[in-house]
């Protein structure tokens, strides 16, 4: 199970991020499953090492344009590229009418069979090897989160042990591999479980966007190997998240923590956090890691292979986690989301988290000019601050004694 992010921006594309789409490559089947298909997804596929001829299933979360406007172009291109295998598309109730209208008014004829499935909470697809389930999330329109679960694989069969005991090669080995008990002609019986290692747990991936924090996302993501969750807003803009029914970075982290997932990828970032703006996606990462340390930032064309051992893939470079000295326990951080509020006037707040503060926050709370704030930001990017004495030595113009500085 190999994940490739094709679009990680929300609403509109930016210079470095396209709108939503994630590819799940299944090498053993030579198949690609897509999750959402925002505008220009087929362009992203051309820039990747993925082959459109291997696309077999497309799962649409909801009917907003930044998640579906690339679908029809991709389906048409698959046909022009010579695809003849059936493509199955899954999504909300209005998806079939949308596709039918586009096919009709563009006079598009596909050379392959296109099957559209209307999803409901529960099992969406299963073939014995993989099972896809979905849950209804909490957004302005019906939106579904998807979970792909791989079936458990039998443990290694120790053929040398069977040979040493004189068990004849043939169909009996197949029965032993399945854990069955066999009886030989000489009357000896053998339990197949004695010849096999424990089964290998199947891997799982969960994709949740668009949604505000909700219990169904937590239930869907229970103990998943990878959770891909939207983080449209920073924590300081939680009021916007609640108003627009999107998630903050901390909401995504809370879902990951409650669900006890192995690894969280943040995606679906607002364009307001693009390079050059006061708040960066790295600030959202720091917010999330304070709650759930095993958090990574998704970026276009980032590739991640889910390992079979349930551990975080060694190929992923470690990310610096912000110091969380102010957090005694995980439970202390996971307060009820309904009770969270955003300070109306941030400059009156008594504390500043120096390793996560934005330039505007530093200007307001520290009473410094933009040049000094940028200098602190630049030094922080190179090496995070660890003590108050270091700040007092580097920036004596700030009255640090009047502030409650958190690291």
From Swiss-Prot:
Spell out the residue ranges making up region: Unknown.
309-407
CDD domains per the UniProt record, alphabetical: RNaseZ_ZiPD-like_MBL-fold
Matching Gene3D superfamilies, A to Z? Ribonuclease Z/Hydroxyacylglutathione hydrolase-like (3.60.15.10)
- Cite the binding residues for Zn(2+) 1: 62, 64, 139, 210
- Lineage: superkingdom: Bacteria
Has the keyword Hydrolase been applied to this entry?
A: yes
Q: What is its EC number?
A: 3.1.26.11
- Report the catalytic activity: Endonucleolytic cleavage of RNA, removing extra 3' nucleotides from tRNA precursor, generating 3' termini of tRNAs. A 3'-hydroxy group is left at the tRNA terminus and a 5'-phosphoryl group is left at the trailer molecule
Q: Which SUPFAM superfamilies match?
A: Metallo-hydrolase/oxidoreductase, RuvA domain 2-like
InterPro entries recorded = Metallo-B-lactamas (IPR001279), RibonucZ/Hydroxyglut_hydro (IPR036866), RNase_Z/BN (IPR013471), RuvA_2-like (IPR010994)
Keyword annotations for this protein?
A: Endonuclease, Hydrolase, Metal-binding, Nuclease, tRNA processing, Zinc
Q: Where is this region: Ribonuclease Z?
A: 1-308
The main enzyme category here is: hydrolase
Q: What cofactor is this protein dependent on?
A: Zn(2+)
Which terms does the record give in the GO molecular function aspect?
A: 3'-tRNA processing endoribonuclease activity; zinc ion binding
Q: Which residues form the active site?
A: 66
Pfam families, alphabetized: Lactamase_B_2
The record describes how the cofactor is bound as: Binds 2 Zn(2+) ions.
User: Per UniProt, where does Zn(2+) 2 bind?
Assistant: 66-67, 210, 268
Q: Which family does it belong to?
A: Belongs to the RNase Z family.
Q: Quaternary state and partners of this protein?
A: Homodimer.
HAMAP family, per the entry: RNase_Z_BN
Biological function: Zinc phosphodiesterase, which displays some tRNA 3'-processing endonuclease activity. Probably involved in tRNA maturation, by removing a 3'-trailer from precursor tRNA.
NCBIfam families from the entry? PRK00055.1-3 (NF000801), RNase_Z (TIGR02651)
Q: Could you identify this protein by its name?
A: Ribonuclease Z
Per the UniProt record, the source organism is Thermosynechococcus vestitus (strain NIES-2133 / IAM M-273 / BP-1)
The beginning of the lineage is:
Bacteria, Bacillati, Cyanobacteriota, Cyanophyceae, Acaryochloridales
């Amino acid at each position: 199970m190999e994940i490739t992010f094709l679009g990680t921006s929300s609403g509109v594309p930016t210079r470095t991020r396209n709108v939503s789409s994630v590819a799940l490559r299944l090498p053993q089947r030579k198949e690609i499953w897509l999750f959402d298909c925002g505008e220009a997804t087929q362009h992203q596929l051309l820039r990747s090492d993925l082959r459109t001829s291997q696309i077999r299933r497309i799962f649409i979360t909801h009917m907003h344009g930044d998640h579906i406007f690339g679908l029809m172009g991709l389906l048409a291109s698959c046909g022009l590229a010579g695809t003849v295998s059936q493509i199955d598309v899954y999504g909300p109730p209005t998806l079939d009418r949308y596709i039918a209208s586009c096919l009709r008014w563009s006079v598009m004829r596909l050379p392959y069979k296109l099957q559209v499935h209307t999803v409901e909470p529960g099992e969406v697809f299963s073939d014995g090897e993989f099972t896809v389930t979905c849950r209804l999330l909490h957004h302005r329109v019906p939106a579904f989160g998807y979970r792909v679960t791989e079936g458990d694989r039998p443990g290694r069969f120790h053929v040398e042990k069977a040979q040493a005991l004189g068990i004849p090669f043939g169909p009996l080995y197949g029965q032993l591999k399945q854990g069955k008990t066999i009886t030989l002609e000489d009357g000896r019986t053998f339990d197949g479980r004695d010849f096999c290692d424990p089964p290998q747990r199947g891997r799982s991936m969960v994709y949740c966007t668009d949604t505000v924090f909700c219990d169904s996302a937590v239930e869907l993501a229970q103990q998943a190997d990878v959770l891909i969750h939207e983080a449209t807003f920073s924590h300081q803009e939680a009021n916007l998240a609640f108003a627009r029914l999107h998630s903050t970075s901390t909401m995504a982290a809370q879902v990951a923590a409650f669900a006890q997932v192995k690894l969280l990828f943040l995606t679906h970032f607002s364009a307001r956090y693009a390079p050059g703006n006061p708040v960066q996606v790295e600030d959202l990462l720091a917010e999330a890691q304070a709650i759930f340390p095993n958090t990574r930032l998704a970026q276009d064309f980032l590739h991640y292979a889910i390992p079979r051992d349930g551990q975080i893939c060694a190929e992923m470079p470690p990310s610096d986690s912000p110091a969380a000295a102010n957090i005694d326990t995980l439970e202390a951080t996971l307060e009820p989301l309904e009770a969270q509020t955003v300070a109306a006037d941030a400059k009156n707040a008594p504390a500043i988290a120096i390793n996560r503060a934005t330039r505007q926050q530093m200007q307001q709370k520290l009473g410094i000019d933009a040049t000094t704030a940028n200098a602190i930001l630049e030094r922080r990017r190179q090496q995070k601050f660890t003590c108050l004495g270091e700040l007092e030595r580097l920036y004596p113009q700030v009255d640090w004694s009047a502030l409650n500085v958190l690291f």
